[in-house]
Structure formats: C-alpha cells, structure tokens
Amino acid sequence: MASELQRPDSMPCHNRQVNSTSSPSPEHLLAEDRVLDHAEENNAAMAKLTLLPGHAHSSVLSERDSPACCSTNLHSENHSDSSDSGNYDAPVGGDSLLGDCELSRQIGAQLKLLPMNDQIRELQTIIRDKTASRGDFMFSADRLIRLVVEEGLNQLPYKECMVTTPTGHKYEGVKFEKGNCGVSIMRSGEAMEQGLRDCCRSIRIGKILIQSDEETQRAKVYYAKFPPDIHRRKVLLMYPILSTGNTVIEAVKVLIEHGVQPSVIILLSLFSTPHGAKSIIQEFPEITILTTEVHPVAPTHFGQKYFGTD
C-alpha cells in the first residue's frame, strides 16, 4: 500500500508540465494580455492605412504615421540608385517615389496608375534592363503601351446604346462618344501610335515636334499638325517617358493655343518621375496623367533603343 500511495509522486515529469500549463500563473496571464493589447493596437493602426489599388510599392497614406511612410520610400529610392548606373537611366532629384505621402497629396486624383501585377512588373524590368536585346525591348514596350492605351480608353466617355443580336434579341450596351483623337509628341511618342490604332482603327492622330533650342536650351516647337476640329475633341496625348515634364508642358500650351482645354487632355505615359508628374499637374491642374510607374530614375534611353538609334 505504501508503494501504491507513492505512485502519483513518481509520475513522468511531462505530466507535471501539462498540469502546470493548464493552470497558468497570474503573471503569465498578465503577459498574454499585454501581447494581445499590443496586437490590437497594431491592427487598429493598420486599419488607418490606405493603399492605392494594386500598388504595393506605390502610395501609402497614413493618418498618423506619415514619417514611417516616407522613410520606406527613401529606402526604395536609395535602392534604385544603387541598381542603376551610368547614363542609361537618368535620375531626376528633388522628390522620392510616388509612395512619398506629401507628393501623393499634392498630385491627387489627376495622376492615375495602372494596377500593378507581375506581368507589368516584368515588362518594366525588361525595358529598364541594359542587357535586353532590341527585339525583347520592343516586344515588351509594345505590350506595355497596349495596356496603357487600353486603360486610357477607359477614361473616355461612353454612352448607352441598344443593339440587336444575330438571334434577334435586344442587348443594352455602351459605345464611345464621338470626338476623340490622339496626339503624339515626336519622336518617342510615335512608338505609341500603333497601340492606339490597334484599339481604335479610325481614330485621327496629330503630331507635334518639340526640341531644345541650341542657343537658349528652352523647349521650342518645330512642327505641329492636328485635326482641324481638335478644339471639339478629347485628346489622348502620347509621350512614353516623363522626366522633367518640360516637353509635355510645352505641348499642352500648343494644344491650348488650338482651343483644347486641359480638362479634356489625357496624357498616356509609360514611366514618370515624381518631379515630371508634379510639374505638369502644377502647371495644368485639370490634366489627367496615366502611367505605369512613378520613379525618380527615368529610362530616357527609350526612344533611341525603340527606333534603333542607340
């Protein structure tokens, strides 16, 4: 009997551990409460963050944590500077990425970004890759241009219409409102013309040539030809790379001289710097800019490589 009464004291130690865990001490409970409270505070803070749709690398707006937001963007900018060397891409200083909270507030809804996904990211990577062949470069550029043009068409007005199907049924749909045209800023803007024609076969396209004056180094208009009724049309202005924004600003001024209002101009671009986008919006607050990426390093080699003159 004595040996049987002693058995409970000689049970394996892991049973005693389970028993101690099932009856936590008051100090342990207080520690768990502190962890849960901390997690709830973090969740509440995260609930105040708003991401632009599809852009994990883009704007992060916070009601109370803007310094943290901006520090993240500065890290991204430093990383990009270390990964791009030489004059292949031209950095434009003065601003960080679009993720900079203050820049996002300044530009606002007039700057529209394509929803980011791996397909677009790969196309951007190939276009920026110094070792990419011209064939791969053009193929990727044309694909990205097509995506930008398709999204640009979504910004144009539609109207409801009724059609009859081959089986005799009525179908309520939509169609473009008349009065749209494209304008390419030569010469890199001409790379986007085919993408627009692939989507709108009969659209009219004008051209404008702007270059820097050799003496004054200021943007100067050398050639401009538009549809005669452009003042009554909505304009898709095509220019793939926004670096300083000066060329686009000059082009918009010419369009205004021909009776076009900035509010009906949609600028289609592949890449933009923060400085370029902000300069255009500050000059013309009503214009709409559509691009795939806002980054301080602009691939200014685009036109030369696309047309084989690099």
Curated annotation (Swiss-Prot):
Residue ranges with Polar residues bias: 16-25
Binding site for uracil: 300-302
GO CC terms: cytoplasm; nucleoplasm
Subcellular locations according to the entry: Cytoplasm; Nucleus
Binding site for 5-phospho-alpha-D-ribose 1-diphosphate: 187, 239-247
Amino-acid positions noted as binding GTP in the UniProt annotation, renumbered to this chain: 134, 143, 177-180, 204, 233
InterPro entries on file: PRibTrfase_dom, PRTase-like
CDD domains per UniProt: PRTases_typeI (cd06223)
Main subcellular location: cytoplasm
SUPFAM superfamilies: PRTase-like (SSF53271)
Residues modified as Phosphoserine: 25
GO BP: female pregnancy; lactation; response to insulin; UMP biosynthetic process
GO molecular function, one term: GTP binding
Region (Disordered): 1-27, 62-89
Disulfide bonds: none
Keywords of the record: Cytoplasm, GTP-binding, Nucleotide-binding, Nucleus, Phosphoprotein
Family: Belongs to the UPRTase family.
Protein name: Uracil phosphoribosyltransferase homolog
UniProt source species: Mus musculus (Mouse)
